[in-house]
Amino acid sequence: MRSQHVLILLLGLVCASQVLGKHLTKVKAKALHYDKRGDCDWPTGVCFYIHDPCPPGLRRCPQHDDGCYLPTNHCCCYP
């Protein structure tokens, strides 16, 4: 009888961990997707090397510099 209770408990833990694991994976995927996008991606702007000027037609927008993946980049925004 005791081994049946242990088995049921183990099966319950395995099922719960499977459900929780899938949920955490989806949450992590959403967070990763948001992190990958950044604040300086299209349609906002494009990241360029910090010592290069923004190309013609784009304006410097330092408020989005943190959205660039590399600290040596700055953001140039579309008008």
Curated annotation (Swiss-Prot):
UniProt keyword annotations, A-Z: Cleavage on pair of basic residues, Disulfide bond, Nematocyst, Neurotoxin, Secreted, Signal, Toxin
A GO molecular-function annotation: toxin activity
Signal peptide (UniProt feature, chain positions): 1-21
Tagged with keyword Disulfide bond: yes
GO cellular component: extracellular region; nematocyst
Propeptide: 22-35
Keyword Ribosomal protein part of the UniProt annotation: no
PTM field: Contains 4 disulfide bonds.
Subcellular location: Secreted; Nematocyst
Function per UniProt: This recombinant protein induces severe neurotoxicity on zebrafish larvae (Danio rerio) at a concentration of 230 mg/ml, but does not show toxicity when injected in blowfly larvae (Sarcophaga falculata). All fish incubated with this protein died within 200 minutes of exposure. Has also been claimed to be implied in calcification, but this function seems improbable.
Entry's family note: Belongs to the Cnidaria small cysteine-rich protein (SCRiP) family. delta subfamily.
Protein name: Small cysteine-rich protein 2
